[in-house]
Amino acid sequence: MARDITFLTVFLESCGAVNNDEAGKLLSAWTSTVRIEGPESTDSNSLYIPLLPPGMLKIKLNFKMNDRLVTEEQELFTKLREIVGSSIRFWEEQLFYQVQDVSTIENHVILSLKCTILTDAQISTFISKPRELHTHAKGYPEIYYLSELSTTVNFFSKEGNYVEISQVIPHFNEYFSSLIVSQLEFEYPMVFSMISRLRLKWQQSSLAPISYALTSNSVLLPIMLNMIAQDKSSTTAYQILCRRRGPPIQNFQIFSLPAVTYNK
């Protein structure tokens, strides 16, 4: 069963690109929704992971300008698509996905991400088989798959359909970095937390030996996997507040593009 969870709309504002020109002020409104696939009921002991191959995690964006849809025939759409495409390095190098495709479908720009850390076989080893073998065990998490992050952004400009593309990029970076830090890392660390995914990448080969060393069986595998996901020290907020040595903090300059002026 699939269900959608929508986050509160966020509003951003910036002045004109030249001398903080008030006339060139740009406003934007951002709304994001995640799609979750899994059992109908949820509880506090849920483990969220990205949709695994052959499925892929989709990052989907569509754009509006002054409440009007920006369509793929427009030059502005092309420039915004280039901005979205510039995030490939972030998804691949910091969150350990492979970007399989950057496509345009029905006026949406879609990134298709393949997880390089988890597979269905590993989920079977870590969760499904221990659950079947140890029916008496408690504390096992229920698996849910995050299949899509969909974002709609509405830009507002006093100058009609004129917008500096270089002025748009900070809005992209500020929104997505704040969304990841304040929401996605806490709710879906195995999908969007660099440190959680990095720890899983480093530690997954050690989980089975630890479980068998302590219990002579696989009973602890689901619990240890869930412990990695639930460790709040993996969040960027924790790393910043503690200012301690540890895994590197993410670089949130996610989007980039040389300054280009668009005028319809």
Curated annotation (Swiss-Prot):
Q: What happens when the gene is disrupted?
A: Reduces meiotic recombination several hundred fold. Specifically affects meiosis, and does not have any detectable mitotic phenotype.
Q: Which GO terms describe its cellular component?
A: condensed nuclear chromosome
Transmembrane ranges, per UniProt, are none
User: Subcellular location, in the record's words?
Assistant: Nucleus
Please list the GO biological process terms of this entry: meiotic DNA double-strand break formation; reciprocal meiotic recombination
> Would the keyword Kinase be found if you checked this record's keyword annotation?
no
A Pfam family cross-referenced in the UniProt record is REC102
Top-rank taxon: Eukaryota
Question: Major place of localization?
Answer: nucleus
Instruction: Tell me the keywords, alphabetical order.
Output: Meiosis, Nucleus
Known InterPro entries for this protein?
REC102 (IPR048920)
Q: Does the keyword Iron apply?
A: no
Any idea what job this protein has? Required for formation of the SPO11-mediated double-strand breaks (DSBs) that initiate meiotic recombination. May mediate the interaction between SPO11 subunits during meiosis. Also needed for homolog chromosome pairing, synaptonemal complex formation, and for the proper timing of the first meiotic division. Not required for mitosis and mitotic DNA repair mechanisms.
Subunit field text: Interacts with REC104; seems to form a functional unit with REC104. REC102-REC104 interacts with SKI8-SPO11 and this interaction is required for proper subcellular location of the proteins during the initiation of recombination. Interacts with MEI4, REC114 and SPO11.
In its miscellaneous comment, the UniProt entry states: Despite weak sequence similarities, may correspond to the subunit B of a SPO11-containing topoisomerase 6 complex specifically required for meiotic recombination. Retains some of the structural features of the ancestral archaeal Top6B subunit (AC O05207).
Q: Which family does it belong to?
A: Belongs to the TOP6B-like family.
Q: What is this protein called?
A: Meiotic recombination protein REC102
